[in-house]
Amino acid sequence: MAERGASGGGSGGDSLDKSITLPPDEIFRNLENAKRFAIDIGGSLTKLAYYSTVQHKVAKVRSFDHPGKDVEQDHEPPYEISVQEEITARLHFIKFENTYMEACLDFIRDHLVNTETKVIQATGGGAYKFKDLIEEKLRLKVDKEDVMTCLIKGCNFVLKNIPHEAFMYQKDSDPEFRFQTNHPNIFPYLLVNIGSGVSIVKVETEDRFEWIGGSSIGGGTFWGLGALLTKTKKFDELLQLASRGRHANVDMLVQDIYGGAHQTLGLSGNLIASSFGKSATADREFSKEDMAKSLLHMISNDIGQLACLYAKLHGLDRVYFGGFFIRGHPVTMRTITYSINFFSKGEVQALFLRHEGYLGAIGAFLKGAEQDNPNQYSWGENYAASSGLMSTSPELCPTQRARSGTFDLLEMDRLERPLVNLPLLLDPSSYVPDTVDLTDDALARQYWLTCFEEALDGVVKRAVASQPESMDAVERAEKFRQKYWGKLQTLRHQPFAYGTLTVRSLLDTREHCLNEFNFPDPYSKVKQKENGLALKCFQSVTRSLDSLGWEERQLALVKGLLAGNVFDWGAKAVSDVLESDPQFGFEEAKRKLQERPWLVDSYTKWLQRLKGPPHKCALIFADNSGIDIILGVFPFVRELLFRGTEVILACNSGPALNDVTYSESLIVAERIAAMDPIICTALREDRLLLVQTGSSSPCLDLSLCTSRTTTCMVLPFAMWVLWTKLKSLVEKCLSPLSILLACSVLSAKSRLDKGLAVLVRERGADLVVIEGMGRAIHTNYHALLRCESLKLAVVKNAWLAERLGGQLFSVIFKYEVPTK
C-alpha cells in the first residue's frame, strides 16, 4: 500500500544554478509588497505562492453640488472624474524547476522589503530537503504542512473560485478539452493523487475528508520500470516514447486469446487481456516505444479501475485526478479517462484540473493565512498575468510556451465581496452563462478572434485619449496592445488555455489587460459627455411618453429601450457611426431599428401580460451609459413604478467599455430625481433601489452576483444624498474622529448586509429584465429563471445577425414565462 500523503519524486534538485538571470517584471511581480509566503517542493518542480498588495489606478466620479440648477440649461458636465490610486490584494503562484531554486531564493531575498511575516509554509517531499536552504536564504522559519491537507484545501479553492477549472479530456473529440461549469456545491468528490504512489481521498466538506485507500503502483512505478525497460531516465522522455508506441505489439489482447469468439463474450477484441503478455512467448526484441506504451496502459488501467471501485463503493460520480503523473500530459489523461469510462460504464467522470500543479502551494498558503480568513472572499483569475494551460501537440507531452520555457504563472485578484448564484436561476447546477462555446465552434472562434484583433487599434486610441495629461499614456497603451495581441495569438493556437473560450472571456481578458497598464476606464469622458447630453433630453422624452395612450406608450417605451441599446461603443458598426456623425441621437437610433415583426418578437405576449396585475418587483440589469440608461431604461423604470412595481436597478460595480457603473447610476438618478416626481418619490420611499452587480464585465454571469454589501451599496437614496453632502462637509470642517462618528450614524440606518442576492429574495422579485448584446445574447440567451424574464437587445454585429437569421440592427425581444 502506498504511504499516506506520498507525493511525486524525482531527481533534478541537486544542481543549483546561481547564474540564471530571472525576468522579475514578468515572473516575481509585486514581490516588494509580498506579505505572506508558501511553497510546495516536489522532486523536480517547485510551486511558490505569495500574497501581495497591488496599487493601481481607478476612475472615480463625484457629483457637483449645484442645488436647484436647471439641468436642461446646464452646460457643465453632470459630474467630475478623477483617477485615484487604490490598493487591492492579489495572489501570485509561480511554478519553476528545482534547478532554479537557489537563484529564485536569492532573488526573493534581495527584493523582499515590505514583508512582516517571519514564517513560510512548506509542503511536499522537498520541504525537508530544502528546509535549511530556505531558512538560510530568506531568514524565514519553515513550517511544514501536511501534504494531503494542502492538496484538499487547494482543490476546494480552485473548484470554488476559478470558472472552468475542471475538464474532461476526450482525445478523439474536437475540442479535446471539455470544461465543466462551476457547480454550486462541489462536494462530495474523490481526489486521486498520483505521485510516486497513489492516494485516494474522499472529500465531503471544506474541512472533512478521509483517506480511503491507495496503491504502491503509481507514477514512481511507471518511472522506475520504464527506466529499467528503456534505459530512459527522464519522466517526460518516457511519456514521449509511450506516445509513439503501439501497445498491441507487447500486450496480449482478447482477440489474441479467443479469436473471433470474443463477440459471444460481449467483449471488444482490442481489450487488453494481459499486459506484456506477448513478451513471454515472442523471440523478437520489443521497441522502447511499445514497452513504454504498454507500461503506461497497465498502470493507468490499474489506477482507473481502483478509482472507479472506490467511487462506486462510496456513491461518488466525480473523480478528480492530480499529481506529477498527470501534469496535463494528453497521453496520460487519455488512458486514465478510457479506464474510468470502461470500468464504470460511463457512470463515473474522470476530471482533471487546469491548475492541479498548484494545489499544494495554494493549500499551504491557505493554512498559513487562516487567521485572515481568505475563504470569506471570492477570488478571480487575472487573465492578463496568468499563463494558462500549456500547449499540447496531438500525441506528445505538453510543449512549453516560447514566452517562458521554465516558469508558469497564475495570478488571482481578491474581489471586493463574495459572489453567489442569483436566487432566481431555475437550476444553478445546469446554468451555463455563455451562449456559444468558441472552443467548440471553429468558425465562430476564427471570426471573433479576428474581430478583436481588428478592433485593437481603436481600443489603443481610446485608451490614450482617455488620459490626455499623462506623459506615458502612449507607451502604456502600446504595452497593452502587445499583451492583448499576444493573448489572442495564444488563443488562436490554444483556445482552451483559459478554460472555455467565449466572447465574454475575450472581452474580460481585454479589460484585465487594460487595467494591467492603468487604463481603468477608457470611456469615462465619453460616458460623462453622453450622460450630460441625455439628461438634458430626459424631460422632453417623458413628456412625449406621457402624452400617449396606454397601449401606444408601452410600445414607445420598448422602442426607447431598444433605441437606447444602440449606443454601444463596443460595437464597431455603432462606434463608426458615432465617430463620423456627432449628431446621431435618440431619434436617429429609433429609425435604425428593425420594423416589427422583430427577429425574436414576444412583444404581443408582453403587452398582454401588462394588462394583468403589476409585478411585485422587477430586477433590471442595465447596459450602457448615456442615452441607454437615461432615455431608455429610466422611462421604462418610471412606468413600472407608476404601475406599482418595485424596481431593483443593477449596474456594473466597475467600468467596462461604455457600460454604466453603479457610481454613475447614483449621480444620474440624483439628477433625474430632481426633474421627475415619480423617480424622486420612489427613491425616497425605497421602492427604487440602485445596486451593484459585483461585475466589471460587458457580459453577465448570473452565478456571480453580490451576496453582501459595503457601505452605500444599497443605501436608500435620500440617505445617499445626505451622506455625500455630509461627507463633503466633514472633510472640510471636522476632525477624523467626527467623520468616523458621522459615518457610523449613517451606517446604522442603512442596510449594509443586503446585497443583490439578498434583495432579490427580500423583495420577492418576479420579473428579470436583461438588456444588451453582452448580457442578453452573448450570455443568458438560454438562461432559465424561476420567474418571468425579458431579454432584449439590438444586434449590432452583422456576422452575428446573419447567424441568428437577421440583419444588422435586428431586434431581440424575448419574453419568457417559466413553466408552472
Curated annotation (Swiss-Prot):
Region (Pantothenate kinase): 2-402
GO MF terms held by the record: ATP binding; metal ion binding; pantothenate kinase activity; phosphatase activity
Effect of inactivating the gene: Knockout mice have a body weight and a lifespan similar to wild-type animals. About 10% of the animals start developing cataract at 2 months. At 15 months, 50% homozygous animals are affected. Heterozygous animals develop cataract later, with 10% animals affected at 9 months and 25% at 15.
N-acetylalanine found at: A2
Record-listed 3'-nitrotyrosine modification sites: Y320
Region called Disordered, residue ranges: 1-20
Tissue: Expressed in liver, kidney, brain cortex and eye lens (at protein level).
Keywords: Acetylation, ATP-binding, Coenzyme A biosynthesis, Cytoplasm, Hydrolase, Manganese, Metal-binding, Nickel, Nitration, Nucleotide-binding, Phosphoprotein
Binding site for Mn(2+): D623, N624, D659
Catalytic activity: (R)-4'-phosphopantetheine + H2O = (R)-pantetheine + phosphate; (R)-4'-phosphopantetheine sulfonate + H2O = (R)-pantetheine sulfonate + phosphate; (R)-4'-phospho-S-sulfopantetheine + H2O = (R)-S-sulfopantetheine + phosphate
Motif (Subfamily II EGMGR motif): 771-775
Annotated family: In the N-terminal section; belongs to the type II pantothenate kinase family.
Subunit structure: Homodimer. Interacts with PKM.
Function per UniProt: Phosphatase which shows a preference for 4'-phosphopantetheine and its oxidatively damaged forms (sulfonate or S-sulfonate), providing strong indirect evidence that the phosphatase activity pre-empts damage in the coenzyme A (CoA) pathway. Hydrolyzing excess 4'-phosphopantetheine could constitute a directed overflow mechanism to prevent its oxidation to the S-sulfonate, sulfonate, or other forms. Hydrolyzing 4'-phosphopantetheine sulfonate or S-sulfonate would forestall their conversion to inactive forms of CoA and acyl carrier protein.
Protein name: 4'-phosphopantetheine phosphatase
Organism, scientific name: Mus musculus
Gene of this entry: Pank4
